[in-house]
């Protein structure tokens, strides 16, 4: 039995508990949590199913004979190879997909069972007496649990039960391949709002509730992350604009201070060479971006200041119009684009080698930037408007124009941008967006920008540790290692290098 302590059950201990082992419970639950954090495929059998449920917040019938009236004897006296009752399998479940069955005859050797189901799981098979016989957490986690013992049937030659183990091995092989690929490529998430949380005591060196941390990056096999110095849009008078500059400067400095605390595990990256060096040293890399050109204030000289502070891109606006351009969201006119000052900002960013980010920009702004920028541009966190009609997403026409420009569109993992029913948005939907964007723009012009700690997060991808799931889903769709190399960082690094080298090329031409 699972130990009677309330922390495991979520309810009070019951007198009919049988033999327990607190040491085994502690070990099993620790292994289960560590495996789940890393998205390792898991198959739980009998007690394993029960542990899954209590580990993630469910409860158990602690003694079926006295707590649940039943027509089924769940402790059979027959041998394990003898099936003693049927189970009904939910048609749309992973278990039905694996076995190809809607009814299975199973054995039964338990006196505990699921009472209250843990959040994030669904029951996928029932016994005739309404006892849950199987659960799964797909696509949130790669976890399946069964109350019966398929290993006994499999050892006796049952080919249907054997499919469960083949499924687990295949999932493990794909997981292993995903990790191997990540060890050989450079993986970058181009947008997080994590610095907003520093003032609340959050640290990138601690694995807590925030989506971004060094530990989670390692679990998800992510090499680098852009930390955005985000500034809310405020009043546009001289005094307010100057305060925005000062606030942004402090935010950027806070990124340096935070990374310095964990210099043995991470570092600031300005170029691809920095990223390669840090990866070879076994460290994570943090690039710096600015979200909202309001941070520039009224003076173009601030762009040079930010360049000297290591800023690699500036998102021209956020959810409201500013002195640079019109926003896609709260705007006077989405067809309007760059202001005269905005055109000067684009020119100066080109001159200094800072990437121009058009996420959050109106369509008018997008087309103006395409027209006036001499360098490729990026959308650091935007998805497909064809699949989810939201003003923050890019139309197919925009995606094609971005590709022609040589730029890159980075898939955003914010549920509202991914699915018309946000709560249902999952990693599977995200890969559908990615797939569509690649079909429209081409494999050389798409990447990933999660928007973690700023609204991003979907079922199956709620933090850095879950990013390996994107890779797994892409492998299952047939994407090659070379494809993944481009999507996860190669495309963005190509644009960044071209933009950074443009000022040097211009200087050589003048000489």
Residues covered by each model-derived region:
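N-terminal hydrophobic targeting/anchoring segments and the immediately downstream early-domain regions
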Residues: 177-333, 389-448, 452-511
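Amide-donor transfer/coupling interface in amidating biosynthetic enzymes
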Residues: 21-40, 65-179
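Histidine-centered catalytic micro-motifs
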Residues: 106-112, 146-150, 187-194, 311, ...
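Alpha-helix-loop-beta-strand connector modules within alpha/beta enzyme cores
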Residues: 28, 334-352, 369-379, 440
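Short, small-residue-biased leader/transition segments that mark boundaries at the very start
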Residues: 2-3
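Glycine-enriched alpha-helix->loop->beta-strand junction motifs that scaffold or abut catalytic
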Residues: 140, 221-222, 311-313, 352-354, ...
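Substrate-binding cleft of carbohydrate-active enzyme catalytic domains
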Residues: 344-369, 395-407
